[in-house]
C-alpha cells in the first residue's frame, strides 16, 4: 500500500508536469524506453539497489541512461530526482501508475474484455461503441479468450466488472428459482 502511494505521488507529479508542458505522451514513451533498459539489463536495477555504490555513482549511471534513451531534460531531472530521493526501486510501479493517470488525463480507458472465443471486428466495434457511449471516453480494449467460458462477455474497467457471461446468467436464474 505504501509503495503504491509513493508511486502514485511521483506519477501524478509527472503527469501534472507533462500536462503543463504538453508532454504527457512524450513522457509515456520516455518512461517506456527507460523501463525497457531496466528490463533488458538486470545490472541497472541491481546497481541502484546496491548500498555499496555511492550516490554520485548512481546519479552518473542515471545520467548515462537518460543520454542513451534521448530523454527530455524534464524527464532526466525527474529520473535524477528518483535517485536523489532513493526511489528508483519504485520505478516500475511509477511507470504503471503514470500510464493509468496519463490515460485518465487524456480520456482513455483500457478495459479487459474476456470472451469464450475470438471476437470479430463487428462484435468488437459494437462493444467498443457501447463502452465509449457509457463512459464518454476513448476505449482501447485488451482482449482475452477464456475457453472455460460457456459464452458471453466479461468487461473489466479498473475495479468495475460488467459480467454478461452465460455462467453468471445461469447462476442468477438458479438463485431466482431457489428463492421461489
UniProtKB/Swiss-Prot annotation:
One of its GO terms (molecular function) is proton-transporting ATP synthase activity, rotational mechanism. Its main location: membrane. It is a peripheral membrane protein. It is found in: Cell inner membrane. Disulfide bonds: none annotated. GO terms for cellular component: plasma membrane; proton-transporting ATP synthase complex. The keyword Cell inner membrane applies. Pfam families: OSCP (PF00213). Keywords: ATP synthesis, Cell inner membrane, Cell membrane, CF(1), Hydrogen ion transport, Ion transport, Membrane, Transport. The keyword Ion transport applies. Belongs to the ATPase delta chain family. F-type ATPases have 2 components, F(1) - the catalytic core - and F(0) - the membrane proton channel. F(1) has five subunits: alpha(3), beta(3), gamma(1), delta(1), epsilon(1). F(0) has three main subunits: a(1), b(2) and c(10-14). The alpha and beta chains form an alternating ring which encloses part of the gamma chain. F(1) is attached to F(0) by a central stalk formed by the gamma and epsilon chains, while a peripheral stalk is formed by the delta and b chains. F(1)F(0) ATP synthase produces ATP from ADP in the presence of a proton or sodium gradient. F-type ATPases consist of two structural domains, F(1) containing the extramembraneous catalytic core and F(0) containing the membrane proton channel, linked together by a central stalk and a peripheral stalk. During catalysis, ATP synthesis in the catalytic domain of F(1) is coupled via a rotary mechanism of the central stalk subunits to proton translocation. This protein is part of the stalk that links CF(0) to CF(1). It either transmits conformational changes from CF(0) to CF(1) or is implicated in proton conduction. This is ATP synthase subunit delta. It comes from Pelobacter propionicus (strain DSM 2379 / NBRC 103807 / OttBd1). The lineage of its organism: Bacteria, Pseudomonadati, Thermodesulfobacteriota, Desulfuromonadia, Desulfuromonadales. The gene is atpH1.
Amino acid at each position: 500500500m505504501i509503495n503504491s502511494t509513493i508511486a502514485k505521488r511521483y506519477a501524478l507529479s509527472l503527469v501534472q508536469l507533462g500536462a503543463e508542458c504538453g508532454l504527457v505522451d512524450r513522457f509515456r514513451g520516455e518512461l517506456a524506453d527507460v523501463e525497457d533498459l531496466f528490463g533488458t539489463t538486470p545490472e541497472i536495477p541491481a546497481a541502484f539497489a546496491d548500498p555499496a555504490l555511492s550516490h554520485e555513482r548512481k546519479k552518473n549511471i542515471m545520467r548515462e541512461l537518460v543520454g542513451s534513451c534521448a530523454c527530455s531534460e524534464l524527464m532526466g531531472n525527474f529520473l535524477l530526482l528518483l535517485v536523489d530521493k532513493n526511489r528508483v526501486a519504485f520505478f516500475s510501479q511509477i511507470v504503471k501508475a503514470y500510464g493509468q493517470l496519463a490515460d485518465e488525463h487524456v480520456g482513455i480507458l483500457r478495459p479487459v474484455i474476456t470472451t469464450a472465443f475470438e471476437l470479430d471486428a463487428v462484435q468488437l466495434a459494437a462493444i467498443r461503441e457501447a463502452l465509449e457511449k457509457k463512459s464518454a471516453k476513448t476505449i482501447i480494449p485488451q482482449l482475452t479468450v477464456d475457453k472455460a467460458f460457456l459464452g458471453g462477455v466479461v468487461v473489466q474497467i479498473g475495479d468495475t466488472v460488467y459480467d454478461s457471461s452465460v455462467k453468471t446468467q445461469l447462476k442468477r436464474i438458479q438463485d431466482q428459482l431457489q428463492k421461489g
